[in-house]
């Protein structure tokens, strides 16, 4: 279950990501220029895009907290899927630019061996981004936040990029100068792939793809095992940002009075919302059936 501590982490993690990405953009950019590493400069540009992506995530999480109103009766949660898509697009088009620029430099013959100091920048970047990926992934999963999960994968892409950068820098230092530019292209391929995957996930969320099966099974079992219920006609759900909305129809004895059927449905709704993670809205419909004696 999502605890108060999880919600506190949710409010803090994006600020951590924001300031860390600013720091990484600065130190990798400066170190890349001073050491002559094109791959590290490219990695710094990637971190710069991460700053923008984190701002988008910050905005979307804030807006998604707004209560449902007349204009948006199901709430503002889906803005997190839009934010996830924007993060993915930033990564994808940034990756295309990196690959294009590095390819042009190779064609022009602009390859040189960077200073060994560039290795330090790549190592620090790998460690920092992997830690931020794990931190944000935990917070994103516990809060069921697609925007924070997307931002976590943004950091994982940066960590993978830095691995490619490290390999390229080391290879260039030991006598293969073109490896630095090739590493920058490798960074672009990895980042573009993650950008595409984030957009696919965001589109699935906006298209109301069914929620995880575990959520449906837990809710189904609660409804099925409730008093006066003679079966579950159907159950379906969708993600609305961090929240899960469920629609359930149950079979009850036709001899039950209307208010009694309503009490059964209300008890099921409250039990599901209390016991199933991330479920915030449950609609329980009732279908009367004649029970054979």
UniProtKB/Swiss-Prot annotation:
SUPFAM superfamilies the UniProt entry points to: Cation efflux protein cytoplasmic domain-like, Cation efflux protein transmembrane domain-like
The protein's assembly and partners: The isolated C-terminal domain (approximately 213-293) forms homodimers. Forms heterodimers with MamM.
Gene3D superfamilies (UniProt xref): Cation efflux protein transmembrane domain, Cation efflux protein, cytoplasmic domain
Name the record gives this protein: Magnetosome protein MamB
Task performed by this protein: Plays a dual, essential role in magnetosome formation; required for magnetosome vesicle formation as well as biomineralization. Probably binds and transports iron. Requires heterodimerization with MamM for stability.
Annotated segments matching region C-terminal domain (CTD): 215-293
Family: Belongs to the cation diffusion facilitator (CDF) transporter (TC 2.A.4) family.
Annotated source species: Magnetospira sp. (strain QH-2)
Family annotation (Pfam families): Cation_efflux, ZT_dimer
Location(s), subcellular: Magnetosome membrane
Keywords assigned: Biomineralization, Ion transport, Iron, Iron transport, Magnetosome, Membrane, Metal-binding, Transmembrane, Transmembrane helix, Transport, Zinc
């Amino acid at each position: 279950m999502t605890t108060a501590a999880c919600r506190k982490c949710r409010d803090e993690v994006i600020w951590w990501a924001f300031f860390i990405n600013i720091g990484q953009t600065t130190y990798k950019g400066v170190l890349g220029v001073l050491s002559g590493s094109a791959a590290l400069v490219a990695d710094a540009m990637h971190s710069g895009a991460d700053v923008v992506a984190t701002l988008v995530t910050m905005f979307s999480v804030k807006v998604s907290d707004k209560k449902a109103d007349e204009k948006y009766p199901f709430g503002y949660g889906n803005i997190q899927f839009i934010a996830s898509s924007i993060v993915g697009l930033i990564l994808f088009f940034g990756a295309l630019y990196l690959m294009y620029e590095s390819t042009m430099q190779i064609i022009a013959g602009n390859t040189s061996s960077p200073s060994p100091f560039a290795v330090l920048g790549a190592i620090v970047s790998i460690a920092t981004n992997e830690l931020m990926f794990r931190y944000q992934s935990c917070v994103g999963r516990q809060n069921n936040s697609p925007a924070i999960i997307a931002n976590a994968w943004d950091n994982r892409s940066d960590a993978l990029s830095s691995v490619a950068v490290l390999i390229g820098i080391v290879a260039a230092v030991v006598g293969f100068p073109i490896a630095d530019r090739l590493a920058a292209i490798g960074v672009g391929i990895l980042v573009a792939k993650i950008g595409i995957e984030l957009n696919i996930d965001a589109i699935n969320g906006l298209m109301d793809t069914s929620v995880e099966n575990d959520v449906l099974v837990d809710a189904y079992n609660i409804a099925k095992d409730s008093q006066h219920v003679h079966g579950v006609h159907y159950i379906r759900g969708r993600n609305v940002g961090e929240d899960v909305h469920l629609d359930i129809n149950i079979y009850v004895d036709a001899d039950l009075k209307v208010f009694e059927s309503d009490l059964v449905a209300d008890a099921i709704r409250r039990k599901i919302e209390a016991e199933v993670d991330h479920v915030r809205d449950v609609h329980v419909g009732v279908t009367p059936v004649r029970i054979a004696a």
